[in-house]
From Swiss-Prot:
Activation loop: region residues: 931-957
EC numbers, comma separated: 2.7.1.137, 2.7.1.153, 2.7.11.1
Entry comment, domain topic: The PI3K-ABD domain and the PI3K-RBD domain interact with the PI3K/PI4K kinase domain. The C2 PI3K-type domain may facilitate the recruitment to the plasma membrane. The inhibitory interactions with PIK3R1 are mediated by the PI3K-ABD domain and the C2 PI3K-type domain with the iSH2 (inter-SH2) region of PIK3R1, and the C2 PI3K-type domain, the PI3K helical domain, and the PI3K/PI4K kinase domain with the nSH2 (N-terminal SH2) region of PIK3R1.
Domain PI3K-RBD: 187-289
Family membership: Belongs to the PI3/PI4-kinase family.
The protein's name in its UniProt record: Phosphatidylinositol 4,5-bisphosphate 3-kinase catalytic subunit alpha isoform
Length: 1068
């Protein structure tokens, strides 16, 4: 199911001409040609058409124009009925300018909703109706129960529940204020400014309150009422009654954006308030009548689509209507027959022969040796060969999969043979109804991904490539007299008890497990110590075979160390049903673990549905909405490792997205941004469909965002393709002319920011918009903030739109920096990182937040003249900061620069962020330093003449040292520099304590297909920089050495910067 074929207004045409001839077919058989404006609405076109039709024969056969709608063929080759007649001709995405007039039939509302959903996800919903796979149809029906449940939850307490869905509280996970933030308060109190609109002309009045930081919003409102009524000279009893009467009628809103304090959290737990305390700013809140918020909330009505009433297309055995037998009663080894291949595209002169390589895998681990077919000539790839595997059918685990690839062999006699995969595919050995696959099957294979080093791709997607013009392999599984099912839990438990008692030499009894457990509790102290040591190792450290045996023999004691579960699962022999059955019994009653630990069980190493189900239950129990938002990128990625469409993780994420609109917003965009990827377009498309069906009126907001993004993609495509040779002036003229057109003005104004749905983008400030100079022609866009109190937050919103750069790596790096910042803040380290907003919204398309009042180091150096620009004057940066921060605020600016520089030194070192130069390090006017453009990480650095260009572990040039030491001659001998080093050491050790979390977050991203994150070897770079094989003392010494290299090797960075500056000047 590919995404949309083009971003143009007609097939193969970016922009329609201003006037266009449209062929209109009327119900009386007449064809009328109309000249229409490209921006004309359908209602205008219809009116003109019926006026014109009176001049043609048979016009008396036509009914009134309101009885008809238009229908046409779109660029997806789909027939679409246009019910919304306010749509413009240029926005219909027609294949050709043909319109047919028809009388509408069928359920109008459902058709309109289906069109809106199709537009949002980028493919027509009817494509799902045509899929014959029963798993797809059952998923679509069954997932509606989650949708219904979520909608019912939103309506539970009427308006308040609905408000909580639309405006979920934006709070920190914990109410605890870190000590260094608490110390910024005045004896635990905070000054808050409360604003009230006092007239229809929006006249404002403000009240300044000093309140305890842990007050709940209702107490703040009560205090505001007391202050407001002070002039009324009420008695204490009257005041009490007044407060009681009005306190519950108001709510607090953040001035300048759509954020509300709707729940009884301590004030300082709200993120807005906490950031104000940290930055030393006074929070501005607006007092608003609860009723006015409730009255503008949309009423959600969720209607079951017509397909929910269709009967399942699953075969009778799937519905339990035919005789079945347990997998465990079969007494034969697994075998598979490879029949033949078609569409194998190879160069016969280069390739001698081809063969099929196969393996049975559980996650990335083989369950037995791989087996190859005979080699055959490429011209006629037929095998008809049974392959026998060294594994009994009863020993197949639930998540077993067959992995295969067609491979070529190259090499003459005596020379070393070269084996190369041509195409790969994977098949689940059990379908979604627990049934063992049987009979013949044709599998369309996938192209080999960049960076695949092995012949098989066991962690790749299962199932057939929807593109039928790819290599196709025909194969056959054994047939059995009855349908073969994986045993249920009661049979598994019985077998586990039997195998434990056999192992322990007890008689077969249900008391077997508990007796075994009692013996396990009498472990020697050094065994317990060894278990604890294994438990604390990072997820990438190898577990030896001896350690696996040791873990397994003490598996019952392991229950007392719940977080050891991932290591224990890796020690299970998944090709032994005895061990798997016992592990299932342990997992069933395993104590819950922290969400950060549970997430490890969702990566590609843990495919078993029981294990993944346990992980999801831990997330349901302990993962706050704030933490879920923080880890959402990874949780969406690991959906790719789920065996089937319907699973507990999908249900958990969908329910969260449908009960918290902020989570839903990013859930939508993370899924939508991968719809071009054929390996996941069906899975993600189905999930998007179910989200869009139940997200209520937010679908209209999402479609406004999608429409705006489509317009910007079209514009930038023209700039890169048709206007690439024009001057900047000509390109800018074209941009402004296009943006002034009515359809562009409609689409690009008055919608919610995809970067942050609490921010509204009002009117475009065209005079402030520009095309940036880099190769992909990004757009710098500027919108007004339409909020009534915008001057108290920001009056305009600047965003960079990029078309042509993959922003997923930037998005991941910024997320990791944000998590590092949280860890540091919670440990009392205020390193003032600036992880600005960044969102990938499609294939190499995305948005980046512009940080206000910031400049690149190069811009600052260029202000210092040629000498500064060419880096020979290291004092330029310090002088610039001094000029910007005169008097008392100078010390604060240097302190801010020092803290942020320390944070970014540590972060860029740990993450191996490359390509650092003076155009991607920025400084704000107040001294805060931050990095941008994270195109290279995990030590994949840019190369020049075959060598890695950067030769120091992180950037710490003389320019920075001079600022940190306040301009001292010998920078590294100052107290300020010592303090800076101390900050770096503390920051490094703090992240090292959380190494497992960062390794897990990167491991969960392995399925993303990012070029620099392909395997566990890439992630091993973090093990190296955090020195996880060393003691804490040794790790600190290692980091100190790296830091020493950085400031002594500063001249090499300087040379890189000089070359970069010269190159940029040449480009400009």
């Amino acid at each position: 199911m590919p995404p949309r074929p083009s971003s143009g207004e007609l097939w193969g045409i970016h922009l329609m001409p201003p006037r266009i001839l449209v062929e209109c077919l009327l119900p009386n058989g007449m064809i009328v040609t109309l000249e229409c404006l490209r921006e004309a609405t359908l209602i205008t076109i219809k009116h003109e058409l019926f006026k014109e039709a009176r001049k043609y024969p048979l016009h008396q056969l036509l009914q009134d124009e309101s009885s008809y709608i238009f229908v046409s063929v779109t660029q997806e080759a789909e027939r679409e009925e246009f019910f919304d007649e306010t749509r413009r001709l240029c926005d219909l995405r027609l294949f050709q300018p043909f319109l047919k007039v028809i009388e509408p039939v069928g359920n109008r509302e459902e058709k309109i909703l289906n069109r809106e959903i199709g537009f949002a996800i980028g493919m027509p919903v009817c494509e799902f109706d045509m899929v014959k796979d029963p798993e797809v149809q059952d998923f679509r029906r069954n997932i509606l129960n989650v949708c219904k449940e979520a909608v019912d939850l939103r309506d539970l307490n009427s308006p308040h529940s609905r408000a909580m869905y639309v405006y979920p509280p934006n709070v920190e996970s914990s109410p605890e204020l870190p000590k260094h933030i608490y110390n910024k308060l005045d004896k635990g109190q905070i000054i808050v400014v409360i604003w009230v609109i006092v007239s229809p002309n929006n006249d404002k009045q403000k009240y300044t309150l000093k309140i305890n930081h842990d007050c709940v919003p209702e107490q703040v409102i009560a205090e505001a009422i007391r202050k407001k009524t002070r002039s009324m000279l009420l008695s204490s009893e009257q005041l009490k009654l007044c407060v009681l009467e009005y306190q519950g009628k108001y709510i607090l809103k953040v001035c300048g954006c759509d954020e509300y304090f709707l729940e009884k959290y301590p004030l300082s737990q709200y993120k807005y308030i906490r950031s104000c305390i940290m930055l030393g700013r006074m929070p501005n809140l607006m007092l608003m009548a609860k009723e006015s918020l409730y009255s503008q909330l949309p009423m959600d009505c969720f209607t079951m689509p017509s397909y929910s009433r269709r009967i399942s297309t699953a075969t009778p055995y799937m519905n339990g209507e035919t005789s079945t037998k347990s997998l465990w009663v079969i007494n034969s080894a697994l075998r598979i027959k490879i029949l033949c291949a078609t569409y194998v595209n190879v160069n016969i002169r280069d390739i001698d022969k081809i063969y099929v390589r196969t393996g049975i895998y559980h996650g990335g681990e083989p369950l037995c040796d791989n087996v190859n077919t005979q080699r055959v000539p490429c011209s006629n790839p037929r095998w008809n060969e049974w392959l026998n595997y060294d594994i009994y059918i009863p020993d197949l685990p639930r998540a077993a999969r067959l992995c295969l690839s067609i491979c070529s062999v190259k090499g003459r006699k005596g020379a070393k043979e070269e084996h190369c995969p041509l195409a790969w595919g994977n098949i689940n050995l059990f379908d979604y109804t627990d049934t063992l696959v049987s009979g013949k099957m044709a599998l369309n294979l996938w192209p080999v991904p960049h960076g695949l080093e092995d012949l098989l791709n066991p962690i790749g997607v299962t199932g057939s490539n929807p593109n039928k013009e790819t290599p196709c392999l025909e194969l056959e599984f054994d047939w059995f007299s009855s349908v073969v099912k994986f045993p249920d839990m009661s049979v598994i438990e019985e077998h586990a008890n039997w195998s434990v008692s056999r192992e322990a030499g007890f008689s077969y009894s249900h008391a077997g497990l508990s007796n075994r457990l009692a013996r396990d509790n009498e472990l020697r102290e050094n065994d317990k110590e060894q278990l604890r040591a294994i438990c604390t190792r990072d997820p990438l450290s190898e577990i030896t075979e001896q350690e696996k045996d040791f873990l397994w023999s003490h598996r019952h004691y392991c229950v007392t160390i719940p977080e050891i579960l991932p290591k224990l699962l890796l020690s299970v022999k998944w090709n032994s049903r005895d061990e798997v059955a016992q592990m299932y019994c342990l997992v069933k009653d395993w104590p819950p673990i922290k969400p950060e630990q549970a997430m490890e069980l969702l990566d590609c190493n843990y495919p078993d549905p029981m294990v993944r189900g346990f992980a999801v239950r831990c997330l349901e129990k302990y993962l706050t909405d704030d933490k879920l938002s923080q880890y959402l990128i990874q949780l969406v990625q690991v959906l790719k490792y789920e065996q089937y469409l319907d699973n507990l993780l999908v249900r958990f994420l969908l329910k969260k997205a449908l009960t918290n609109q902020r989570i839903g917003h990013f859930f939508f965009w993370h899924l939508k941004s991968e719809m071009h990827n054929k390996t996941v377009s069906q899975r993600f498309g189905l999930l998007l469909e179910s989200y869009c069906r139940a997200c209520g009126m937010y679908l209209k907001h999402l479609n406004r965002q999608v429409e705006a993004m489509e317009k910007l993609i079209n514009l930038t495509d023209i700039l890169k393709q048709e206007k690439k040779d024009e001057t900047q002036k000509v390109q800018m003229k074209f941009l402004v002319e296009q943006m002034r057109r009515p359809d562009f003005m409609d689409a690009l104004q008055g919608f919610l920011s995809p970067l942050n749905p609490a921010h509204q983008l009002g009117n475009l400030r065209l005079e402030e918009c520009r095309i940036m100079s880099s190769a992909k022609r990004p757009l710098w866009l500027n919108w007004e903030n339409p909020d009534i109190m915008s001057e108290l937050l920001f009056q305009n919103n600047e965003i960079i739109f990029k078309n042509g750069d993959d922003l997923r790596q930037d998005m991941l790096t910024l997320q990791i920096i944000r998590i590092m910042e949280n860890i540091w803040q919670n440990q009392g380290l205020d390193l003032r990182m600036l992880p600005y907003g960044c969102l990938s919204i499609g294939d190499c398309v995305g948005l980046i937040e512009v940080v206000r009042n910031s400049h690149t180091i190069m811009q600052i150096q260029c202000k210092g003249g040629l000498k500064g620009a060419l880096q020979f004057n290291s004092h330029t940066l310090h002088q610039w900061l001094k000029d910007k921060n005169k008097g008392e605020i100078y010390d604060a600016a240097i302190d801010l620069f020092t803290r942020s520089c320390a944070g970014y030194c540590v972060a860029t070192f740990i993450l191996g962020i490359g390509d650092r130069h003076n155009s991607n390090i920025m400084v704000k006017d107040d001294g805060q330093l931050f990095h941008i453009d994270f195109g290279h990480f995990l030590d994949h650095k840019k190369k020049k003449f075959g060598y890695k260009r950067e030769r120091v572990p992180f950037v710490l040039t003389q320019d920075f040292l001079i600022v940190i030491s306040k301009g001292a001659q010998e920078c590294t001998k100052t107290r300020e520099f010592e303090r800076f080093q101390e900050m770096c050491y503390k920051a490094y050790l703090a992240i090292r304590q959380h190494a497992n979390l960062f390794i897990n977050l990167f491991s969960m991203m392995l399925g993303s297909g990012m070029p620099e994150l392909q395997s566990f070897d890439d992630i091993a770079y973090i093990r190296k920089t955090l020195a996880l094989d060393k003691t804490e003392q040794e790790a600190l010494e290692y980091f100190m050495k790296q830091m020493n290299d950085a400031h002594h090797g500063g001249w090499t960075t300087k040379m890189d910067w000089i070359f970069h500056t010269i190159k940029q000047h040449a480009l400009n």
